[in-house]
Amino acid sequence: MIGKEQENNAELNQSSIIDVTEETPPEVVAAGYRTATGDSPTVLYRTSAPLMVDQMNTHSISIPNQTNRSQQIIDITRGLHVNETNDNGLNDYIPETAPFGDVGQNPSADGLKDVLVEHRELFIKSTSEEDPLLMEVRRGYVLVDSITIIRFSGDDLHSPLSIKFVDEEGVDLGGLRREFWSLLLHNISHSCYVTGKPGRQTFQSNYLEKKKKTFFHLGQLIALSIIQDGPGLPIFSDIVTDYIINGQTSVINPDDLPDGLKDALEKMQNSASDRDAKEAYSSIMDIATDIGFIVPITSFTKKHVKPLQAAFIESQISSCKDELNQFIEGLDTHQVMSLLRQPENRASARSLFSGRVKPITVGKFRKLLKFKYAEGNANQDQRATGIGFLTFLQATKGRATEINGIKLELKDVMMWLTGSTIIPAIGFHKLIDVDFADSTFVNTCALALTLKTQPDLSSEDAVSYYTELIINSQTFTKE
């Protein structure tokens, strides 16, 4: 009797499932309920629906992959639109997004220099100079080594930072520290921790590194960079910079998107008809689904393009929000983040994180140089040599400083002279002294350049001489 009753119950359950599938309108099934007596819906929670033993075994074996899951979502949303009279259409209401626009390139952080210097004096103990926070790193593994060191240096972050490169001579009087920060910036922007096109990057979601609090320690490093001769981390897109500085999005810039995706969306926006927009949408529907934009092809219109753009741009935050928040938490080491978020500091602080900082110009770089000409007979020879070097600086704006396909830029000259490709957030402690002698050499710690006196060198030869000298130096790296 018991066996017969179980068999009858099984048949009844199977009949109920068939009834829902065959008789209930598809839009009702997709919404998660079926019609009961009268007009009241009876909720059917899918997770508690009865499953036969064979069905359970099948589910345990056939776990759908990401593509299948995406297809199931697409099928469900498509089902909502099979009936054109359906009142639950997804495109009945299209929410507004943040305004689209362009904040423009960010100016330098010159306005923050004095504020940051004062802040450093409050938190970095000058009395600890004999026992600094020593980071001894391998030149080719700056990022890995520095994160390893800072994980175990939480109690030593108030000490002045001192850098030593393994197997290299040199005492850090400022130059090695600036060089370290430049190498760290380069390493981070080319690491597995970030994604996106250069100058428009965001963090890459990374479960293991998040659990290890790596992004928190990255934030700590950048906080130290900002107040100890570094440039910050100017690599992020506009929307990520907004989030770091303001905690929210103010303007959405399509230029934050990868070029291919940006072009596809522009083509969609400029479509002559909804039909053409649907066709363009079909080529990116899978990645749209991955970021949570669920609209079936049959329902897509040109009105959906702006929200779709916004969804892709905002995913630069939503896809890695935990990593970003962890980074921001680390940035508040020595209350640096709190300082930068003060209303009067926010505009200048953008340049410490935005990948759109205006590059230094030859004119501004020239103002960093202080030529020290001798009196008497040597004066004219030194001035002629100085003119040759200034001609070389001007030539970096064109193709004259290219050798064998390798292009030397002004930032490379700055790295050679100062150890930094970007002016530090707190600025340089002095101008770069330019002296003259029998050979050319630099002292990045002292911010001093000595030029070989060569009054008879032609302009063309001067450009070639300094170009070859810097390209063959230890500080030059070709991306």
Regions found by a protein language model. Name each.
Residues 7-10, 26-27, 72, 170-173, ...:
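Eukaryotic short linear interaction motifs
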Residues 86-227, 232-236, 248-253:
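Hydrophobic, conserved cores of late-appearing folded domains
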Residues 122-145, 240-479:
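C-terminal catalytic/scaffold cores in eukaryotic proteins
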Residues 1-110, 115-122, 213-214, 462-465, ...:
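Phospho-regulated scaffold assembly regions enriched in serine/threonine/proline and acidic residues
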Residues 1, 168, 172-173, 219-239, ...:
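Extended amphipathic alpha-helical scaffold segments
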Residues 65-68, 236, 255:
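Long, low-complexity intrinsically disordered regions
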Residues 14, 148, 175-178, 199, ...:
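Short coil/turn segments at secondary-structure boundaries
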